[in-house]
Amino acid sequence: MLAVTLDALSAEAFARPAQTLAVEPASELVEATVRRFSMELDAAATAVQWRTSVPRGVGLGGSSAIVIAVLRALCELHRVALDPARMAELALAIETEDLGIAAGLQDRVAQAHGGLVFMEFGDGGAYEQLAPKLLPPLVVAWRADAAQDSGDVHASLRTRLKAEDATTVAGMKELAEIARAARAALIAEDHERLARTADESFDVRRRLLTLDPRHVELVERVRALGAGANYTGSGGAVVAVCRDQAHAATVARALAQLGCGTLAM
C-alpha cells in the first residue's frame, strides 16, 4: 500500500524523568505505551505530556500517531535508538497485545518512517521511501460526526482472513496488486492512472465490507467532480487525487459543503 504522513495533522509528546509513571492528559493508550517501553527496554519511570491534532476515529491513524510520538519522546529521553521497523512493530504490539485493539502495521510503518512510503506485507515484505514531490495535488477530508472504531472494521477482516474466506483472500490480493500499480503510476508521474487506482481500491473495499453511507457519500462526491477517491483508512476520511491545484480547490469546497474538515496538499 501507499501512505503519506501529513505535517498539519500530527501528534507530539514530551517526556521527562519522574519517580512514578505520570501521563497528562490521562490516557490509557499513552500509559500502555510508557509501560511497554519501560518493560522492553528496562527504562526508568517517566512523565509524559502529549497532544494531537489528528481527528480520532476517522481512519487517519490518530491512535497510532500518539503511540509513535510517545515512543519517539521516550527514545530521546532515554537515549535509545529504535529503527522505524522496530518502532512500528512495538507500536502495533502496544495496541494489539496490551490493549486488545484489532490493528495492522500500515499506519505505524508510515508514521515511523514519515513522508511517502510504499509498503509490501507478508513474506518478503519491504518498505520503500518515496519522494513526496511525486504526488499530485491531494485533498484529505473527514467527517467528525461519522467517527467509528477502526478496530471493529479490522476485526471483521481479520476473522475472515484467518478463516481463509476465499472472497476476502482474493480481495486482499487484488488490493496488493492495485497498490503496486499505484506505485508504478506515481513513479511514472502518471497522475491519471494514480487516480484510477484510488477508485479501484475503493471498489474492492466496497465489495469486501459493509460501508457507512455517510463515508461513501464523500467518495461519490469526489468522483462526481472527476477526481479519484479512496478511504484513507478504516472509514470516515477520504483522499481525493486531483488534476491540479484548481481542481483540488473545487473538490475541497464541495467536501466542506458536506460538513467535512478538509486539508489540501
Q: Which positions does each model-derived feature cover?
A:
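Short active-site-adjacent helix-start/loop capping segments
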Residues: 21-23, 56-59
